[in-house]
A protein has these predicted regions:
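A generic structural signal for tightly packed, nonpolar segments enriched in small/aliphatic residues
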Residues: 1-153
Length: 153
């Protein structure tokens, strides 16, 4: 994918691709859109995404796995329950929060038909694992369902 190219995805969103090194989240988009379609006929659907996000996760958590949940998942204390279970079994999790500024960061403000940025302008090393989770949630409009993002190293 050439840099700064617009793509139209299954979820019906136009995305400006700015970094082809972040291809994992682009592949996951169509899979999430497909699973959302399937979730419409399921009772209490839960969806997990797992990505390496190595650099950002290591900077944030060191050797531990990070988990982030969206609103419905947070209401069920999903990430917190994972963290507590991990502590019992010696497999530690760090809970991270997807904040509203992550959703602002991914908006395409160029005005030429793009809706979202696959990677924001500039460098977001300080929260490099949260905005991809917000990106996946926004593109797939998954906010109505439980979505848990895990970043492993």
């Amino acid at each position: 994918m050439p840099k700064q190219t617009l793509y139209h995805y299954r979820a019906g969103v136009r995305i400006r691709v700015g970094n082809t090194d972040a291809e994992g989240r682009m592949v996951m988009l169509d899979l999430l859109a497909h699973m959302k379609e399937k979730a419409l006929t399921e009772i209490n659907p839960h969806l997990f995404t797992i990505a390496t996000l190595t650099g950002a996760a290591v900077r944030a958590f060191g050797p531990y796995t990070g988990v982030m949940d969206n609103g419905p998942a947070k209401k069920e204390n999903f990430a917190l329950n994972l963290q507590q279970t991990g502590e019992l079994y010696g497999d530690m999790f760090e809970v991270s929060i997807i904040r509203k500024d992550e959703f602002e960061y991914i908006k395409d403000k160029t005005g030429d038909y793009g809706e979202l940025l696959q990677i924001g302008k500039g460098n977001s090393k300080s929260r490099g694992h949260q905005y991809p989770a917000a990106f996946l949630q926004k593109v797939t409009n998954w906010h109505k369902y439980l979505l848990l993002n895990m970043c492993l190293q």
